[in-house]
């Protein structure tokens, strides 16, 4: 199945960028960041933020379907040898108590938001060339109008791969893919009302939060909640390997991205609450879908902290050495595509990043609110 026209736009822009004088510096930065190889490396991007159109009023916060996470202090970040460079150093963090959704936002809940507001998600809109130009070298020519189509990224299992550091081998831009049509225009979410909503950009998640009177969790809040009251645990359930004992989360078993053995009972998304909750009563804090956090992404953020960080909200801006011009936010928790031999994003310390205007088949969110 051939790539959508928007993928051609991506390749077109990359070819232009490769002609710029700073290519050598960008390549050097890329080599320095090899240890950050992740589920998002070489991910096709829309290359343009979507303007906020959420001019609706916020609702009064309801704590139904939420659980109160107690205040506490914990060691944030990795302490073993499994983490990537951006998970170090481990550091002390204090968080105040907050409420958190016990599950990822579902299709049913997101539909209520859409019905109430008429909001159109990023994936349902055509890319904005005027916004796109802001992230490209001055003088970049405009591609043909035919490539500016509403689309989103859908997973396709390839027959073979050359490198697990090149996610473009299994992600394709699909015209008409969005939260209502997760695999494209011929798919739907009928009977999947209790599944996590996907193809959600950071902008979309923020719009939903505004409508519900809630917010996205900070990265520190997310990790504290994911640990479920445990200390120095690798996973939300403790330290037992994910493929030992009973299935604990919706992840990928087998050879990623070619063959999933479905040992956990699922080939792609699972309904929320399909697996046991962690110590705080939170479901799917590992696997199923990546979850947006409010923080900008910088690989060196932890290294710049000192002492005990009190309710940290992340860096003031974004910087990803692999894509310096693309603003990115943090995503946490891993997805149904995470595998022990690949990103292992279901570890509680694992950090990933995605451009704010990008929606994918494995990305959703959950909300938090203050007391």
PLM regions and their residue ranges:
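GGW-centered surface loops in extracellular recognition modules
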Residues: 38, 58-67
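Functional-site microenvironments in short loops/helix caps that host divalent-cation chemistry
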Residues: 23-37, 42-46, 68-69, 75, ...
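Short capping motifs at secondary-structure boundaries
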Residues: 98, 113-122, 212
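Positively charged n-region of N-terminal signal peptides that target proteins for export
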Residues: 1-4
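Sec-dependent N-terminal signal peptides
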Residues: 7-14
């Amino acid at each position: 199945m051939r790539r959508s026209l928007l993928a051609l736009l991506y390749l077109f822009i990359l070819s232009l960028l490769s002609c710029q004088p700073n290519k050598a510096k960008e390549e050097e930065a890329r080599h320095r960041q090899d240890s950050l190889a992740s589920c998002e490396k070489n991910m096709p991007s829309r290359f343009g933020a979507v303007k906020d159109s959420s001019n609706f009023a916020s609702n009064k916060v309801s704590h139904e379907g939420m659980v109160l996470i107690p205040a506490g202090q914990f060691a944030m970040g990795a302490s073993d040898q499994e983490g990537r460079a951006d998970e170090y150093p481990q550091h002390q963090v204090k968080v105040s108590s907050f409420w958190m959704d016990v599950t990822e936002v579902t299709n049913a809940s997101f539909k209520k938001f859409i019905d109430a507001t008429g909001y159109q998600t990023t994936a349902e809109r055509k890319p904005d060339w005027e916004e796109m130009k802001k992230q490209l070298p001055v003088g970049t020519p405009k591609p043909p109008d035919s490539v500016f189509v509403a689309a989103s990224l859908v997973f396709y299992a390839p027959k073979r791969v050359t490198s697990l550091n090149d996610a473009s081998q299994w992600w394709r831009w699909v015209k008409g893919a969005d939260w209502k049509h997760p695999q494209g225009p011929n798919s739907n979410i009928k009977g999947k009302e209790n599944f996590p909503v996907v193809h959600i950009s950071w902008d979309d998640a923020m719009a939903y939060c505004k409508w519900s009177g809630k917010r996205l969790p900070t990265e520190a809040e997310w990790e504290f909640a994911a640990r479920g009251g445990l200390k120095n645990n690798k996973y939300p359930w403790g330290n037992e390997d994910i493929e030992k004992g009973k299935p604990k989360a919706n992840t990928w078993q087998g050879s990623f991205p070619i063959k999933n053995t479905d040992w956990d009972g699922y080939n792609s998304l699972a309904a929320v609450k399909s697996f046991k909750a962690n110590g705080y009563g939170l479901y799917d804090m590992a696997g199923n879908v990546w979850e947006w956090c409010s923080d900008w992404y910088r690989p060196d953020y932890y290294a710049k902290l000192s002492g005990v960080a009190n309710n940290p909200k992340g860096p003031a801006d974004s910087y990803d050495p692999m894509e310096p011009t693309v603003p990115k936010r943090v995503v946490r928790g891993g997805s149904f595509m995470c595998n022990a031999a690949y990103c292992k994003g279901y570890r509680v310390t694992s950090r990933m990043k995605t451009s704010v205007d990008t929606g994918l088949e494995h990305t959703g969110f959950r909300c938090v609110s203050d007391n």
